[in-house]
Amino acid sequence: MKFLKKLLLKILGEKNYLFFTASIFQRLYRTGRLGKEYQDVYFLRSIIHKGNYVADIGAHLGYYTFELSQLTGVGGKVIAIEPVSKFSAVLEKIIDKKRLENIELKKVALGGKGDFVEIGIPIVGNQKKFGYARIKEMHEHLQYAETEKVPNVNGDELFKEIPRLDFIKCDVEGAEVPVFNSLLLTVDKHRPILLCELADKKERIKMFELLQPFQYKAYLLNDKKLHELDVFSDELAISHNHYFIPSARIQQMKHLF
C-alpha cells in the first residue's frame, strides 16, 4: 500500500493524487465496497434527514461532506470546515463540478489560540500523512513535512446565525475538546447529535464532562446499532468514533439502540 501511494504521488503529483483519492472513496462508498472502518459514513443514512443542517469539522477530502450533502438535500445545509488549503481546494473542485449548492465551505480552523494557527502535515514512518494534519502548537513533538498559517475562529461566532443544527461530525486530530469548548453556546441552543473521533479514555472523559450540562450520553456504533458507553471504563473502545446524543433526541432515535 505504501508503495502504491508513492507510485501514484509520483505519477499524478500531489494535487491530482488528493483529487483521485477523494474520487475513489466516493466511488467505493456508492458501490458499498468500503470496509467496517467506514461504518459511520454508512450510518449517516440512519440519522440524517432531508432539511437537516449539519457541520463537518475537519472535512478533509469530503468523506462525510458529500454524503451529508446528498442526505440533507436541497432544503438542508452542510457547513464544511477545512483549513488546509490542499484539502479545501479538492473540496471546492468537487463542489463546483457537482454543483452542490447546499455545501458552504469554511477555510478556517477552530479550537486554536489567537486569530491564526499553524496547521502541519506530519511525517509518520517516513511518509507524509495527509490524514493526520493538525494544529502544530498542540503537537510540537512531531516532525512536519509542511505547515501553513490559517485563520482561527470561535465556533459560537461561526454558527451564531444558523437557524438549526442537527449534527456535527468533528475529526481534528486531537483538538476535539478545544473545538467544543468554543461551541458550548451552539450546543446548548441546538442540541445536535455529535460524532467525534477521540483517541483515548482521557479524551472521551473530557468530552463527556464538557457536555454534561446539556444532558448528553456517549455511544459507540457496532453492527449498525448504538451501544451506550461507560466513558470511565478501562475497557478498550471498539472504535475511536464516539457518538454523543442529547436526551432531547433519544426518543426519535430509539430504533437505533
Question: Positions of the model-derived regions?
Answer:
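Phosphate/nucleotide-binding beta-alpha loop and adjacent structural elements of enzyme active sites
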Residues: M1-F257
